[in-house]
UniProtKB/Swiss-Prot annotation:
Catalyzed chemical reaction(s): D-fructose 6-phosphate + L-glutamine = D-glucosamine 6-phosphate + L-glutamate
Main EC class the enzyme belongs to: transferase
Residues in Glutamine amidotransferase type-2 domain copies: 2-221
Domain of life: Bacteria
GO molecular function, one term: glutamine-fructose-6-phosphate transaminase (isomerizing) activity
Natural source organism: Bordetella parapertussis (strain 12822 / ATCC BAA-587 / NCTC 13253)
Recorded name of the encoding gene: glmS
Span of domain SIS: 286-426, 459-600
Protein's name in the database: Glutamine--fructose-6-phosphate aminotransferase [isomerizing]
Length: 610
């Protein structure tokens, strides 16, 4: 979602701030801005356009300085407008602005604080909760910005990551985090803040990941961190190699297309040359944990939730362990019955998804002790919070609509299935060898499906004029149908729904007409004949079927039946393979419709607020 960059240096940091914002554009935003200390004054430029336009405006305004902050905003409180864009200034009365501040998150008690600050003379120029923090810091300021921020955050309820600097202390930037990510970048006589280490790629590779409750004081030659209790703490610096090429398109039209075609590499890297199935793939002590548990509780949001639904089919059928899958944002508010013997599994691309983190903490508060995360970021809060972890190696995903993160999550969850089965004595050596062979061939199988792109592009031309679509799947392919429908609605803005094919007669069939494309996933599995009957129900009502069928499924093109043949049936891993054509269909449909594929309206990449 929102992005933060800040710096204190002995050189002009304007290019660093702007470049950092460009690297954070993938998170989604509707406005942006930068503020700097210049010649004894606070100066800023804000825009509701793209960062490229902001950069041009900054050059026109001749902004430059050695201390500053920058921000990309995804609107929560207040409409997307320049006056709501960050950074926000604070001054009392007619005084010159003294405080500049940017903020990610949601302050739940902002109305109460706003009224209090208005009562002592502060005038608000925006609708945001962020301006409340700026005025609060200014109100508490008595010559020491670090102390003022510590006092201010004690008054805040909700989630936040903030960066702030003061006109009266020009060589200092202060940051704080609670429930929203913030990192420190270390330099030589210069230091940096960002909401994502990617923003600092090419500037520094020495990164400190702040913990919840931390407040950090950045000066030229010093970084000082205190925890929630105000006690000075040391946080380990990590050497982080972020490849700037991840933020470059190369020969591709969009990042989503690039990331779709990176999936053979991403899945191969996630498998990391695994020679055998062992619980220790998920961390030290995993064998003991896997022996103790009697069930799994999977917590996730969005696309990651669909990965969890797929894993439920695998784990219950192969490892024979009961699995519950919960939408994280619902689970934490439901009066559920906890099972202390369950393994809580969280799934998150970023490892910072606010709802999933909150659900994880809620599960632990109910006495559920064993936790595992499947995550793409090794240094994320999710990994730090969990007992066990499997790090996918998808690489940085820029497009808002998840592609390679999803397939690598599925790959990791299948490995988890096999490790659980082995621990329970339900995986023979022959079965292990067979599954490992299939996994090693998976990148090539994905590559073969990517070769179907020209055929899928022809379908996209037909889909582009539609306003509704239906996706059907059965068994372990039903979650893949859900994911396909989500992708289409996310980036093409076509309303799409997914159903188990067996549920057609229980309502969705009423929607089927010649104007409703029906996308069907038709692998050659035990449910194929049942699925064929469901497809005939659609044809009988004049519906147009678009079928991804395995080569030997004996489903042929006919009137009202359009078929693309998948290269091969891939057994238990078929859901991963069948994901790929649905991604391509959504992508090319969106291209024909002319939408902003990488930055769809109203959506953000990393959802770090509840």
């Amino acid at each position: 979602m929102c992005g933060i960059v800040g710096a204190v240096a002995q050189r002009d940091i304007t290019p660093i701030l702007i470049e950092g914002l460009k690297r954070l554009e993938y998170r989604g935003y509707d406005s942006c801005g930068v503020a700097l200390y210049m010649d004894g004054h606070l100066r800023r430029t804000r825009s509701t356009k793209r960062v490229a336009e902001l950069s041009e405006q900054v050059a026109e305004d001749k902004l430059g300085g050695f201390t500053g902050i920058a921000h990309t905003r995804w609107a929560t409180h207040g409409i997307p407008a320049t006056y709501n864009a960050h950074p926000h200034f604070s001054a009392q009365g007619k005084d010159e602005p003294r405080i500049a501040l940017v903020h990610n998150g949601i302050i739940e008690n902002h109305e109460e604080l706003r009224q209090e600050l208005q009562g002592v003379g502060y005038v608000f120029e925006s609708q945001t909760d962020t301006e409340v923090i700026a005025h609060l810091v200014n109100h508490l300021y008595a010559g020491d910005l670090f102390e003022a921020v510590q006092q201010a955050v004690r008054r805040l309820q909700g989630a936040y990551a903030i960066a702030v600097f003061c006109r009266d202390e020009p060589h200092r930037v202060v940051g704080a985090r609670q429930g929203s990510p913030l990192v420190v970048g270390l330099g030589q006589n210069e230091n940096f803040l960002a909401s994502d280490a990617l923003a600092l790629a090419g500037t520094t590779d020495q990164i400190i990941y702040l913990e919840d409750g931390d407040v950090v004081d950045l000066q030229l030659a010093r970084v000082w961190i205190v925890d929630q209790a105000g006690k000075q703490v040391e946080r380990k610096a990590h050497t982080v190699q972020v490849h700037t090429g991840a933020a470059e398109l190369g020969p591709y039209r969009h990042f989503m297309q690039k990331e779709i075609f990176e999936q053979p590499r991403a899945v191969g890297d996630t498998l990391q040359d695994i020679e055998s199935i062992t619980p220790e793939l998920f961390g030290d002590g995993a064998y003991k944990v896997f022996k103790e548990i009697d069930s799994l509780l999977i917590l996730a949001c969005g696309t990651s939730y669909y990965a969890g639904l797929t894993a439920k089919y695998w784990i219950e059928s192969i490892a024979r362990i009961p699995v519950a899958v919960e939408i994280a944002s619902e689970y934490r508010y439901r009066d559920s019955v906890p099972n202390p013997n369950a393994l809580v599994v969280t799934i998150s691309q970023s490892g910072e998804t606010a709802d999933t983190l909150a659900a994880l903490k809620h599960a632990r508060s109910l006495g559920m002790q064993h936790t595992l995360t499947v995550c793409n970021v090794a240094t994320s809060a999710m990994v730090r919070e969990c007992e066990l972890a499997y790090i996918t190696r998808a690489g940085v995903e820029i497009g808002v609509a998840s592609t390679k993160a999803f397939t690598t999550q599925l790959t990791a969850l299948f490995l988890l299935t096999l490790a659980l089965a082995q621990t329970r004595g339900r995986l023979t050596e022959e079965q292990e060898a067979e599954h490992l062979k299939a996994l090693r061939h998976l990148p090539a199988a994905i590559g073969a499906v990517l070769a179907l792109e020209p055929q899928i592009m022809a379908w996209a031309d037909r889909f582009a004029s539609k306003e509704n679509a239906l996706f059907l799947g059965r068994g372990m392919h039903y979650p893949i149908a859900l994911e396909g429908a989500l992708k289409l609605k996310e980036i093409s803005y076509i309303h799409a729904e997914a159903y188990p094919a067996g549920e057609l007669k229980h309502g969705p069939l009423a929607l089927v007409t010649e104007h409703m494309p029906v996308v069907t996933i038709a692998p050659k599995d035990a449910l194929l004949e049942k699925l064929k009957s469901n497809m005939q129900e659609v044809r009988a009502r004049g519906g147009e079927l678009y079928v991804f069928a395995d080569a030997d499924s004996k489903i042929a093109n006919a009137e009202g039946m359009h078929v693309i043949r998948m290269p091969e049936y891939y057994g238990a891993l078929s859901p991963i393979v069948h994901t790929i054509p649905l991604q391509l269909l959504s992508y090319h449909t969106a291209c024909v419709r002319g939408t902003d594929v990488d930055k769809p309206r109203n959506l953000a990449k990393s959802v770090t607020v509840e």
